[in-house]
């Protein structure tokens, strides 16, 4: 019965048995009644012991049975019976390159009936099957996107919500959980929810450069769309004073042409001019570029919204081998 749709034990058992699990709206309290509601007798006649006994003279009603079995005359499509328990998977596509997408994310995409996300990221998720439904929306409609995903999953769909990078880093996992937290809907609560990690832009850029995040570091978004700029300034000041390596997301946009230089002014109060800086643009995508510079030479003209900026700590250093490219790393020791 549908009232038991949220029971994890049923989902686990179905997976272990590799059998479809379907639920049906019914008030029946025994297995035979549920079977009657799910599968018309014309398709699968059955004989139930408790009901057969009910037709014979007796003074007490038959006891309900926990199991009932129907044997159909022909194969029955399980997808046509009742509803499935919906599943919502929030997954990270990684920075963009196909070989940097995790196997778990790829499996979740392959299993999904519906793909939900910002149009650019839905395109990144491809190639997709013709039978998969695509639900694309604007990049700023995160909560609406999350609610739509829950509505689809509540109807028994297998929904993949896609983000670039890691879904838990300035991406859709928080929006999905916020939507669930603010909802009073038993159907949403019954949805099977999963979050699949991905390679974040900061980690992809760091790996391309070497190991600039090899010691303590923090990630800060410079976008003030969802938080006041004063909060951002305070966090930059404390993180820079504590000598964290800093990875800046969303450094510059047309609507925010000056905040990045203001952020650098704060960092420069705590870091030496020769502090190593890594600039990674579109890492993991076609046309990717990587550059190293110093805090003194860095300016807003060198970056855009697609640039990951990593400002090293006081111990971050550059090393070159045989005149080749520089590698950047932050030592694990601290002295």
Regions found by a protein language model. Give the residues of each.
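Class I S-adenosyl-L-methionine
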Residues: 2-33, 39, 76-79, 83-98, ...
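Internal, active-site/partner-interface "lid" segment
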Residues: 32-35, 51-65, 211-260
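Class I SAM-dependent methyltransferase SAM-binding "motif I" and its flanking Rossmann-like core
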Residues: 169-245
């Amino acid at each position: 019965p549908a009232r038991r749709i949220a029971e994890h034990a049923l989902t686990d058992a179905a997976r272990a048995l590799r059998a479809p699990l379907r639920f049906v709206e019914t008030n029946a309290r025994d297995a035979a009644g549920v079977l009657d509601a799910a599968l018309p007798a014309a398709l699968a006649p059955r004989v139930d012991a408790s009901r057969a006994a009910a037709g014979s003279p007796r003074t007490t009603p038959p006891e309900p049975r926990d199991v009932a079995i129907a044997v159909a005359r022909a194969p029955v499509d399980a997808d046509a019976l009742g509803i499935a328990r919906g599943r919502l998977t929030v997954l990270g596509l990684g920075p963009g390159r196909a070989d940097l997408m995790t196997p778990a994310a790829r499996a979740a995409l392959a299993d999904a009936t519906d793909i939900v996300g910002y149009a650019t990221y839905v395109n990144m998720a491809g190639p997709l099957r013709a039978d998969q439904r695509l639900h694309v929306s604007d990049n700023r409609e995160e909560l609406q996107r999350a609610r739509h995903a829950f509505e689809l999953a509540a109807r028994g769909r297998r929904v993949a919500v896609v983000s670039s990078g890691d879904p838990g880093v300035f991406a859709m996992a928080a929006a999905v959980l916020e939507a669930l937290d603010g909802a009073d809907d038993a159907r949403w609560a019954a949805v099977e929810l999963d979050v699949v990690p991905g390679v974040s832009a900061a980690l992809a850029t760091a790996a391309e450069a070497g190991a600039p995040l090899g010691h303590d570091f923090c990630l800060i978004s410079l976008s003030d769309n969802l938080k006041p700029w004063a909060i951002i300034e305070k966090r930059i000041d404390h993180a820079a004073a504590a000598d964290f390596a800093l990875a800046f997301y969303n450094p510059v946009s047309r609507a925010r042409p000056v905040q990045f230089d203001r952020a650098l002014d704060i960092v420069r109060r705590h870091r030496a001019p020769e502090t190593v800086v890594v600039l990674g643009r579109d890492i993991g995508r076609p046309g990717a570029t990587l550059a190293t510079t110093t805090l003194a030479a860095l300016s807003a003209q060198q970056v855009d919204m697609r640039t990951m900026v990593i400002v090293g700590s006081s111990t971050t250093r550059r090393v070159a081998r045989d005149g080749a490219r520089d590698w950047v790393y932050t030592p694990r020791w601290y002295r």
